[in-house]
Structures are given as C-alpha cells and as structure tokens.
C-alpha cells in the first residue's frame, strides 16, 4: 500500500473512526499523539496565559430546531448522520477539541445561526 492510498483511506474515515485509528496506533507503537508541551520562559509565558489560542467547542443545548443543528454538526465535523444525532441528543457534548480561535468562533456562529447554544472552553 502506498502513502497516497493510505491518505485516501484516511480521508474517507469519519471523525470517530479516525479517533479509533489514533488510539490503535498509540497502543500498537507505544506512543502518544498528544502534542509535546514546550516550556516557555518569562514574559512569553505571561502572554500565553492571557490569551488562549486553542478552544474546545462544546454544544451545550441543541435548541428547538434539532434537525438544522444536526445538519450543521455534520457539516462542521464531517460526522455521519447517526453520530451527529447522538451528539445533538446527548448535549452537552464536545464537538471538537483544541481548535484554533478563529475556527472555534466560526463554528459557534454557524451553530448559533440554527438555534444551538455553544460554549468555547
């Protein structure tokens, strides 16, 4: 199997399948997919503490129009219908973790448009 074939296979996976793949790779090779934490000194550490650069996007309430919220969740996460419905029905649920501020704000705005309540943590 070539690298290109592997990449194509990964592109076709859902978020849940990708999560399972990462966990299986971690177990198989005894590694962690977590990003290494760099120690920052002095003023740079204070600046980093002031403004967060990554956020978790949490669906706190689907609101009255669940169908539109499910469609928005599918569009934003790439999940299948069943997985998106489970997240919406089980709110509060984390949609995405460690998302850049701009993307997190965009996701929040799109979900708010369809009546969902979203929190950035």
From Swiss-Prot:
The UniProt record lists the keyword Ribosomal protein: yes
GO biological process: translation
Keywords: Ribonucleoprotein, Ribosomal protein
Family annotation (Pfam families): Ribosomal_L12, Ribosomal_L12_N
Self-association and partners: Homodimer. Part of the ribosomal stalk of the 50S ribosomal subunit. Forms a multimeric L10(L12)X complex, where L10 forms an elongated spine to which 2 to 4 L12 dimers bind in a sequential fashion. Binds GTP-bound translation factors.
Function: Forms part of the ribosomal stalk which helps the ribosome interact with GTP-bound translation factors. Is thus essential for accurate translation.
Family the UniProt entry places it in: Belongs to the bacterial ribosomal protein bL12 family.
Protein name in the entry: Large ribosomal subunit protein bL12
Gene from which the chain derives: rplL
């Amino acid at each position: 199997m070539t690298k290109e074939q592997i990449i194509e296979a990964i592109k076709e996976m859902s978020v849940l399948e990708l999560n399972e793949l990462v966990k299986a790779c971690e177990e198989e090779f005894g590694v962690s997919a977590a990003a290494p934490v760099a120690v920052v000194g002095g003023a740079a550490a204070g600046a980093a503490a002031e403004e967060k650069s990554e956020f978790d996007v949490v669906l706190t309430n689907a609101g009255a129009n669940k169908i539109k919220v499910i469609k928005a969740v599918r569009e934003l996460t790439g999940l299948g219908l069943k997985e998106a419905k489970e997240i919406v029905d089980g709110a509060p649920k984390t949609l995405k973790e460690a998302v850049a501020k701009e993307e997190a704000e965009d996701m929040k705005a799109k979900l708010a448009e369809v009546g969902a309540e979203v929190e950035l943590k």
